[in-house]
Every structure is written in C-alpha cells, then in structure tokens.
Amino acid sequence: VLEGKADQLVLVNCCDSMRRVYDIVASTGKCKFLYMLDLPHEDNECEKVKFAGAIHRLKEAYEAYSRQQFDKERFIKSFTESEKERKPYIGVLGVRVSGVLEDMIQDNIQMKVNNLTCTGGRRLAVLPEEMEIMDEDAMFLAYADALLAQMPCFRMNNSTRRNQLYLDPDLKGIIYHTIKFCD
C-alpha cells in the first residue's frame, strides 16, 4: 500500500503489530478499502458465531465498496485441494513466516518445510459439497469454524491441535519463529 502496489487491504488483528499496520495504512489515506477483521482468542461456539458475524460484515463492507455481489460458487471452489504426497517435513510454528524465510529454511535443512503459522495456506476442513447447500449464515459459520479449527497460533488459548501435531509421524522437527512485541 505504501509503495502504491495495493489499494485494497484486509488485515486480521492477530497481534499488536497488525493493529499498528492498520493504523499506519489508515493514516496515509492511500488505501481505498481497508478493513480490520477481529480474530478471537478462543475457538468455542460463542466465538465461532461471533467470528462468523465478523466475516459476514467484511463481506457486506466489500460488497458496498466494490459494488459487486459475493460469489458463493467462487468462494466454495477456493477450498478444493489436491491430494498431497506424505513425506518427512519440518514444521514452522509461531508468528507469520514469509516465503523467503520458508525457502531459506528448506534450502539449509534440505527437507520439506510446512508453514503451520497463520500464513501457511488454506488447509481448511470444510466440505465444498456441504457448503453448496447451506444458506449464507450457515456457510459463514462453517467457514469460521474451519478457520478456528486450523493449527492455532500461540496467541490462541486452546492448544489441543498443537499437541496433536506431535503425533504426526512425518513431522521430523519444529522451528518456532517469534518476533519481539507480539501480544
């Protein structure tokens, strides 16, 4: 945004650094669409409903900005994933990791790297066939549930899925990436 390469931005308030990014971008006035999505710290039913509402408000805000209707079919197609070959890997946990850092780790360790941070990709446990028949509220609730069911960052309070990771026979090591001043 600051370099003029993007004029639409959705940020997730995963940590204080993202809130500061939002403040800086907002102060420049260079972003035509700027939205902060609130991410809960918990993954209980109440938080899932609240998060689904936040996602729905994002959808409505973007529709109003872009004057385009939400494309449910395109949304659902974004969840199709090809079957991945199982092989040994190093997991990267912690705060977001850039592709450059992922490549550097892989080049130095000579093993596949799985980015298990919040920027690690779309590994969502949703069934596109089921979402096709849902109304919009149910679909966004299923989406919120799937997002909150991903590998939790260390900011999230429920660590059960992190504990399950250690049982993966393909996991050969973990690199925990952190930054100073994360909440």
Where does each model-flagged region fall?
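An N-terminal assembly and electron-transfer interface module characteristic of large anaerobic redox
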Residues: 1-183
